Amino acid sequence: MIPRPSSRLAAALPAFFAALVAAISATSPGEPARASWRDVAPVQATLRAGGIDEASFDVYVARVGEENVQRVREGDLDHLVYYLLQSSRISSAAAIEPAVSARRLVESLDTDRRAAYLRGDRGAAPPVPPEVTARIAALLKAAQAPRGDARLTYFGALLDAAYADPRTRAAGLATEYLRVMRFLYEKEFVAQREASPAAAVAELYRRRGLSTDTAVEAGYVVHLGLGVLKALEPARRVRRVLIVGPGLDLAPRTGLDESAAPESYQPWAVLDSVLSSGLGTPGDLEIVAADINPRVVAHLARAREQPPRLRVASSLHESPSLSLSPEYRDYVDRFGGALSAGTAAPARDLGDGQRGKTVAVSAQAARALRATPLDIVTQRLDGERFDLIIATNILPYFDDPQLALAVANIAAMVTPGGAFLHNEQRPIIGDLAAAMGLPLQQSRHAVIATVTGAKAPLYDSVFLHVRPAAAP
């Protein structure tokens, strides 16, 4: 028999739970909710062009949601493959450059078998090279005793989630290696022979796993976009920011840096830029980081309670043939000024032409961060409104109908007078955003670095859409 509470306690319980619910509601983002066909009325033409109508809409959204869960798994395993090929922590053997491995693997096949393998015929897959098999074994051994290595701990947890039976892990990773190599070969070698290599690569990205990749360079174009926003309206104030897909720096395809723990830079970069530009003020700013990957969300939730010490470093290394633009160098030099309790350390040469610094995030800055799960294609945060929504380097993963849903969900969360900032260059996004009441206000292209002999500099773009203050 369950004991009954005393009458005093019984009387207090409703008030206690009401206060608890109110506190959670005040500090947590709204629950993810799916849009209805009516909610996406302005972009229904794009959906119909993709074969989706009112009768099939709910089934389509559910299917995309399921596919995105699988794409998250594949994206995580992509990073795991890149890690096991390059890590010096798990093996003293020479690191294997993924694209080089892909080329050797595929071009060892005869013409017919190569074509079958690239079509996805598992029966045509080549054997996994011995040096890769050795690295798979080294990873599985190292993951059993990570010894405080945060990146290895992350991948060990991923192995547990992906392969409940440890006996299946070596074979499972071999299969993932072959899948990743097929994608890399198509991207780096097959697509480059097409009439429009960029379009061919873009099509591949709409089918690949959802990557958590993030880098300091992504923060630079957001910083520039916020500068444009401030210049257009100096009195503008930003109190609530939603970052869609902040990501986590785990294991890039090239240049794995194991000198620092995995980190999600974008929330801190956005916080720093909003404060340093004067768009927001400490204590009156909330950053909501929403990601489809639950491991990214968990990482950022911990960061709120345990403010990180960021190793901020450009992924580009200066050399006689590569020069960082003065504006980008200045951004790296100034990064973190609004994040630290004291004065942020100056940037310096970290060796091998890499520029960076260490920034200790203050407890006050960390308290501005919230993390929540969200699939922006199929979901929106119910009842939430934001002064600014940022989505960089995630929109290329979506085809046109998926992009229409993502833009509709973003638009539903932009407050009147609010802004949407992204770096997706497909023209259709301008049409979709305008249809949802977010017309393009300005765009800017920014040079990050110049490369001797290259046809064009390394650059990125930023596009700023603003909803009229009187919502249509």
Region spans (language model):
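A short acidic, Gly/Pro-enriched loop at the edge of an enzyme's catalytic core
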Residues: V377-I389
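Class I S-adenosyl-L-methionine-dependent methyltransferase module
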Residues: D39, V43-A55, V59-A195, G247-R370, ...
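Conserved Class I S-adenosyl-L-methionine
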Residues: R311-L316, P320, V332, D431-H465
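A short SAM/SAH-binding and catalytic strip from SAM-dependent methyltransferases
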Residues: D387-P401
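Class I SAM-dependent methyltransferase Rossmann-like catalytic core
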Residues: V180-V238, L256-A260
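Bacterial N-terminal signal peptides
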Residues: A12-S25
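A short glycine-rich, Lys/Arg-flanked "PGG" loop and its adjoining helix->strand segment in the class I
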Residues: A404-P416
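Conserved beta-strand signature within the Rossmann-like core of class I S-adenosyl-L-methionine
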Residues: P416-Q425
